[in-house]
């Protein structure tokens, strides 16, 4: 199964120069620019033009419509499977999606580090194959520059849960500077941020293959 991974498009989805075909298109959050229902409808119209047989979306901290008017936002997103602390199995591959990130200023889907996030990550089933979260785990694709010094701002509790799982892949975004592929044990980790740190949609979609588990 070929996964095509994007994230953090911030309503600039039409500026992505080329989106490879694949079995499942995954958007790891921050699909919206202003966070409005109109943004959701525009994003959905664009998804309809893409050839992928399956499309999965999780929300991010800019995606206010999914937090403030969740029923209306989900109704508007007819072209994708929306995951919020929920999962779906596609052709034998088990996906789980979650929007939460550690608190930073006043954005959507944010929780305090510690117990609140720990409880969310404990909802991830042990048999998950592909995890989709908006934010990164601590120390992987999560470095931002604070003055002259880099700082890892990912979630410690998410890293702890990943260490307990046998994931094939973990797909996220949120930290634009961390775009790229990483490896943690036997797990492929993908920071699929489409927009760079200047909010230009310059980063290419990342493609990877996963396989149904036997037995």
What are these regions (language model features)?
Residues 87-91, 157-165, 169, 176-215:
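Binuclear metal-dependent phosphoesterase catalytic core
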Residues 32, 37, 104-105, 127-168:
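Active-site-proximal segments of metal-dependent phosphoesterases and phosphodiesterases across multiple
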Residues 10, 16-19, 108-128, 132-133, ...:
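Active-site-proximal loop/helix segments of hydrolase catalytic cores
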Residues 40-43, 72-80, 112-118, 148-159:
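Charged helix-capping and loop-helix junction motifs
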Residues 1-10, 92-101, 129-134, 188-194:
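Active-site-proximal beta-strand elements of phosphoester/diester hydrolases
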């Amino acid at each position: 199964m070929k996964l095509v991974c994007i994230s953090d498009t911030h309503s600039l989805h039409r500026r992505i120069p080329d989106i490879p075909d694949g079995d499942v298109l995954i958007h790891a959050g921050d699909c919206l620019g202003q966070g409005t229902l109109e943004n959701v409808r525009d994003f959905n119209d664009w998804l309809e033009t893409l050839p992928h047989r399956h499309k999965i979306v999780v929300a991010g901290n800019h995606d206010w419509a999914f937090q403030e008017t969740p029923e209306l936002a989900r109704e508007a997103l007819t072209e994708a499977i929306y995951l919020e602390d929920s999962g779906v199995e596609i052709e034998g591959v088990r996906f789980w999606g979650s929007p939460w990130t550690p608190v930073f200023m006043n954005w959507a889907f944010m929780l305090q580090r510690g117990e609140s996030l720990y409880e969310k990550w404990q909802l991830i089933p042990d048999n998950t194959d592909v995890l989709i979260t908006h934010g990164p785990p601590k120390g992987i694709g999560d470095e931002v520059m604070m003055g002259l010094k880099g700082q890892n701002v990912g979630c410690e509790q998410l890293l702890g849960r990943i260490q307990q799982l046998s994931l094939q892949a973990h797909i996220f975004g949120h930290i634009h500077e961390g775009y790229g592929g990483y490896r943690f044990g036997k797990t492929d980790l993908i920071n699929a941020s489409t927009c760079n740190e200047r909010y230009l949609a310059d980063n290419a979609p990342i493609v990877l293959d996963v396989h149904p588990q036997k037995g």
